UniProtKB/Swiss-Prot annotation:
Family affiliation: Belongs to the semaphorin family.
Keyword Lyase carried by entry: no
Alphabetical keyword list: Developmental protein, Differentiation, Disulfide bond, Glycoprotein, Membrane, Neurogenesis, Repeat, Signal, Transmembrane, Transmembrane helix
GO cellular component: membrane
Residues covered by the Sema domain: 35-484
Chain ranges passing through the membrane: 972-992
CDD domains membership: Sema_5A
Extracellular face residues: 22-971
Record-level GO BP terms: axon extension; axon guidance; axonal fasciculation; blood vessel endothelial cell proliferation involved in sprouting angiogenesis; branching involved in blood vessel morphogenesis; branching morphogenesis of an epithelial tube; cell chemotaxis; detection of light stimulus involved in visual perception
One term of GO molecular function: heparan sulfate proteoglycan binding
Protein name, entry field: Semaphorin-5A
């Protein structure tokens, strides 16, 4: 660009800003006190998260007994996670089948609702009891905690799990195996109940469709405390006479309650409820009526609760703390009773003050609780209100709603401090220090953001693990783990002390912020927590995102071009309260159109020749500037040439001629040399050599061998028994030489023969030859060598399958001396041995799979086999030891009796036959159940000594007349009695038949809803639960189910010896929808 105006425009466009303080802002705004906020970016290094594809609604969290794993329940999934880093151990999909979903859709429910939402997740020993909504057909399973795919049992979820994912519920499992659940028991949610099932005690529930017991409750939590089981919930206040309002309540039942007798059968006789008060004191108190969550500290008998205002009022939340003794005091006080609907609610003395679940020892009501059954039916609501520990809530905040809480007890430098963690409906965790004394207040220490900026969602679950000081948060799409001790976040002493964090203090020895456990000395550990921390409101500015690229214009001298421009603002955030302005450009410019311009010419290049005519070159390029984005290209040539040295003549040319041919190699083999030559033309001053050499015929010469003829036989001065020896010689030489004449005599070969003196046997040369060096000489007294005797054969190298053995001899009998002949023949001899194959011992094959059990009940057996074929025994090897067949017992449980007892034998009929009958006691017999006849007959058996009665005929006419009169009278009498008996019998039969039909219908429906035999989640039997939908009115439901108890309450569903106290609260934070059902 050219010109001063263009340069100034460029500087302003690029936004070269100096660092400067912002303009003065409102001092009052910058001096307000706000609590510290830990952003998602700041908490990121400590945060651990778990996500799974297609898994949402992580609303159930619990720990294994060893506190090494986190068990998570989400929609259609169960997970096992490592506590350390939330890494996945096991994932199990638990989804509804298509038939159940279609049935759910047919009832008008959405695809989102017709899923399996996990709402009960309880750990007992090494088992996991879990229930899901299963598309409005709740079902429960008992699984192995170490392998979630291993299902031990499956039962109906009715009265244990809500039908709808929007219904609030709570459940706990006691040490004796009883399951206490508070939930809606029907599809539309009109029948809420507190229900006990499983275990050894009979099933009980709250009174059905009685608003004085439960009036549209929203269940929050439950706890097993002493002799009682406590439930916390909120409901429409039945005692409130003016309008409709919601009260929060504690309720309790005795764990040894077995229900009433004749009155309150199958119903709690110890159910009582009171009201919890959490309010802001004043001339007109401000009430927080709706309980949202609780947390129980068993060591201190304290129950923390979070309360909010009604959803239709201004959002406000509070935390109140209740002592268990205050709740017990309310239950020991008077009742609040209303005689009838037109009467007022009045206090009534408690007939059983300080009731501790005592039972009757004798009489008609033995084992029943001490409460009078009529009192238990009338007196439900307590008169006194449970007041919190302090008159002012421990913590209050307007314009927010809390949904979940957890409490940790921390040892500070001087005292124990209670830290409250509050989950909000917009996805943050507020860390609150409870009041240190009655006169002091609470402090909001910090607020932790679990999502990036401008994103939020409600918290689904909150669990604290005190042993590891860790907080686990269940959210819609993931699970988060937050460490409670983050002292290393504070780098300086002022930041550490100023944070007012009860977990942290400054260690003067280590010069860093540590927890009390990490400090080297408590006397050198400094902490100050009497005041509340405040947030530094100074905010440095930060740029927001760039705007999209847009066209803009620019001036280049007299030409106008186009560019692309974008800008950004210093508003994410804007500088506040003395913060620095943003550093960097606020505008960027790119892709500006530009006309091309020539660079200056380069210098002329050197002449292309040193003599004679040559040429020179100079160049320029269109890069000053280069044309861009549609700009004009340069006009003209980018290269110029000119002649040079046109008047400078060149001298004669001196040069080498070409190389001549290669001369003959100096050697035919073994490496020689070749040469070639050239000559210098037009003078003697050519650079370089005129001769060039290179090797040739480098291949090795062939091996030559030369042998001399034998010399004549010459006698040797050695005599033996009158004879003499003669010998002759010859020499052999070999080498790789190009000329055979270059060979020299090498190794000498000698032959000797023995000639007898008499000439009879001639001369013999057997074994008398050998090779000697040319320099070798013979002694005058040579001694020929002789072999010693063979040694014994050595041990065979193998015991079987063809081995080798050897034997030796030595040339020392005698040794050859003075040029004597050496021993001829081998000194070592080999022989094969043990050629038979090795024996093969038999080895068992692997066991086959266990066969199916031979019987389904009453004791059967499994069977598995193996064979001695891996390998089979051979060549005398041992056979396999052990059994080839194994059996094991199975299905040893007693077969269920399907027939009733046989009736007594009937009276003999006219044909002399007796009959007896039996009935099938199963409603739906399967397999071999109820096989056989329902009746059985046999001939009558008479006693041999029995004499039948014989009537003797009388001939007297008087007697005959008397008998006739007697018979006629008695005949009419007997006819009247028989007729009346028949009518009475028919009436009784009709009454018994009607009663049996009604009883059988109830048993049939209840059995269909809750089959006695465990069924699969997706079996057709569980689909019969939908029969409830044919009842459209409350009256019809009442007629269908008198007390709505489940028939399958048997101890087989959960082992009471493996369970501990476990709680599960199904509670949700969508406060705008919790009352929709």
């Amino acid at each position: 660009m050219k010109g001063a105006c263009i340069l100034a425009w460029l500087f302003s466009s690029l936004g070269v800003w100096r660092l400067a303080r912002p303009e003065t802002q409102d001092p009052a705004k910058c001096q307000r006190a706000e609590h510290p906020v830990v952003s998602y970016k700041e908490i990121g290094p400590w945060l651990r998260e778990f996500r799974a594809e297609n898994a949402v609604d992580f609303s159930r969290l619990t720990f294994d007994p060893g506190q090494k794993e986190l068990v998570v329940g989400a929609r259609n999934y169960l997970f096992r996670l490592e506590l350390e880093d939330l890494s996945l151990i096991q994932a199990v999909e638990w989804e509804c089948d298509e038939a159940t979903k279609k049935a759910c859709y047919s009832k008008g429910k959405s695809k989102e609702e017709c899923q399996n939402y996990i709402r009960v997740l309880l750990v007992g020993g090494d088992r996991l009891f879990t229930c899901g909504t299963n598309a409005f057909t709740p079902v429960c399973t008992i699984r192995s905690l170490s392998n979630l795919t291993e299902i031990h049992d499956q039962i109906s979820g009715m009265a244990r799990c809500p039908y709808s994912p929007q219904h609030n519920s709570t459940a706990l499992l006691t040490a004796s195996g009883e399951l206490y659940a508070a939930t809606a028991m029907d599809f539309p949610g009109r029948d809420p109940a507190i229900y006990r099932s499983l275990g050894t005690l009979p099933p009980l529930r709250t009174a059905q469709y009685n608003s004085k017991w439960l009036n549209e409750p929203n269940f929050v939590s439950s706890y097993d405390i002493g002799n009682f089981t406590y439930f916390f919930f909120r409901e429409n206040a039945v005692e409130h006479d003016c309008g409709k309002t919601v009260f929060s309540r504690p309720a309790r039942v005795c764990k040894n309650d077995i229900g009433g007798r004749f009155l309150l059968e199958d119903t709690w006789t110890t159910f009582m409820k009171a009201r919890l008060n959490c309010s802001r004191p004043g001339e007109v108190p401000f009430y927080y009526n709706e309980l949202q969550g609780t947390f129980f500290l068993p060591e201190l008998d304290l129950i923390y609760g979070i309360f909010t205002t009604n959803v239709n009022s201004i959002a406000s939340s509070a935390v109140c703390v209740f002592n268990l003794s205050a709740i017990s005091q309310a239950f020991n006080g008077p009742f609040k009773y209303q005689e009838n609907s037109r009467s007022a609610w009045l206090p009534y003395p408690n007939p059983n003050p300080n009731f501790q679940c005592g039972t009757m020892d004798q009489g008609l009501y033995v084992n029943l609780t001490e409460r009078n059954l009529q009192d238990a039916q009338k007196f439900i609501l307590m008169h006194e209100v449970v007041q919190p520990v302090t008159t002012v809530p421990s913590f209050m905040e307007d314009n927010s709603r809390f949904s979940h809480l957890a409490v940790d007890v921390v040892q500070g430098r001087e005292t124990l401090v209670h830290i409250i963690y509050l989950g909000t409906d917009y996805g943050t965790i507020k860390k609150v220090r409870a009041p240190l004394s009655q006169s002091s207040g609470s402090c909001l220490l910090e607020e932790i953001e679990l999502f990036p900026e401008r994103r939020s969602e409600p918290i689904r679950s909150l669990q604290i693990l005190h042993s590891q000081s860790v907080l686990f948060v269940g959210l819609q799409e993931h699970v988060a783990k937050i460490p409670l001790k983050r002292c290393h976040f504070h780098q300086t002493r002022s930041a550490c002390i100023g944070a007012q964090d009860p977990y942290c203090g400054w260690d003067a020895v280590m010069k860093k912020c540590t927890s009390l456990e990490e400090s080297l000395s408590m006397t050198q550990w400094d902490q100050s927590i009497p005041t509340c921390p405040t947030r530094n409101l100074t905010v440095d500015g930060s740029f927001g995102p760039w705007s999209p690229w847009t066209p803009c214009t620019h001036t280049d001298g007299t030409a106008v071009g186009s560019c692309l421009c974008r800008s950004r603002s210093c508003d994410r955030p804007a500088p506040q309260c003395g913060g620095w302005q943003c550093e960097g450009p606020r505008m960027e410019i790119t892709n500006c159109s530009r006309n091309g311009g020539w660079t200056p010419w380069t210098s002329w290049s050197p002449c292309s020749t040193t003599c004679g005519i040559g040429f020179q070159v100079r160049q320029r390029s269109c890069s000053n500037p280069t044309p861009r984005h549609g700009g004009r290209v340069c006009v003209g040539q980018n290269r110029e040439e000119r002649y040079c040295n046109e008047h400078l003549l060149c001298p004669p040319h001196v040069f080498w001629t070409g190389w001549g041919p290669w001369e003959r190699c100096t050697a035919q083999c073994g490496g020689g040399i070749q040469a070639r030559r050239r000559t210098c033309e037009n003078g003697p001053d050519c650079a370089g050599s005129n001769v060039e050499y290179h090797p040739c015929n480098t291949n090795a010469c062939p091996e030559l061998k030369k042998t001399t003829p034998w010399t004549p036989w010459t006698p040797v001065n050695i005599s033996d028994n009158g004879g003499h020896y003669e010998q002759r010689f010859r020499y052999t030489c070999k080498a790789r030489l190009p000329d055979p004449n270059l060979l020299e005599v090498g190794r000498q070969r000698i032959e000797m023969r023995y000639c007898s003196s008499d000439g009879t046997s001639g001369c013999s040369t057997d074994g008398l030859s050998g090779d000697f060096l040319r320099a070798g000489r013979y002694s005058a007294h040579t001694v020929n060598g002789a072999w010693s005797a063979w040694t014994s054969w050595s041990q065979c190298s193998r015991d079987c399958s063809r081995g080798i053995r050897n034997r030796k001899r030595v040339c020392n009998n005698p040794e050859p001396k003075f040029g004597g002949m050496p021993c001829l023949g081998p000194s070592l001899e080999f022989q094969e041995c043990n050629i038979l194959p090795c024996p093969v011992d038999g080895v068992w094959s692997c066991w086959s799979s266990w066969s199916k059990c031979s019987a389904t009940c009453g004791g059967g057996h499994y069977m598995r086999t193996r064979s001695c074929s891996n390998p089979a025994p051979a060549y005398g090897g041992d056979i396999c030891l052990g059994l080839h067949t194994e059996e094991a017992l199975c299905n040893t449980q007693t077969c269920p009796e399907s027939w009733s007892e046989w009736s007594d034998w009937s009276v003999c009929d006219a044909s002399g036959t007796q009959v007896r009958a039996r009935q099938c006691i199963l409603l739906f017999p399967v397999g071999s159940q109820c096989s056989g006849n329902t009746t059985e007959s046999r001939p009558c058996v008479f006693d041999s000594n029995f004499i039948p009665e014989v009537s003797v005929a009388r001939s007297s006419s008087v007697e005959e007349k008397r008998c006739g009169e007697f018979n006629m009278f008695h005949m009419f009498h007997m006819m009247a009695v028989g007729l009346s008996s028949s009518i009475l019998g028919c009436l009784l039969t009709l009454l018994v038949y009607t009663y049996c039909q009604r009883y059988q219908q109830q048993s049939h429906d209840a059995t269909v809803i809750h089959p006695v035999s465990p069924a699969a989640l997706n079996s057709s039997i569980t689909n019969h639960i939908n029969k409830l939908d044919k009842y459209d009115s409350v009256e019809a439901i009442k007629a269908f189910n008198k007390n709505n108890l489940i028939l399958e309450e048997r101890n087989k569903y959960f082992n009471p010896h493996l369970t501990g106290k476990t709680y599960s609260n199904a509670y949700f934070t969508d406060l705008n929808n919790y009352d929709e059902y």
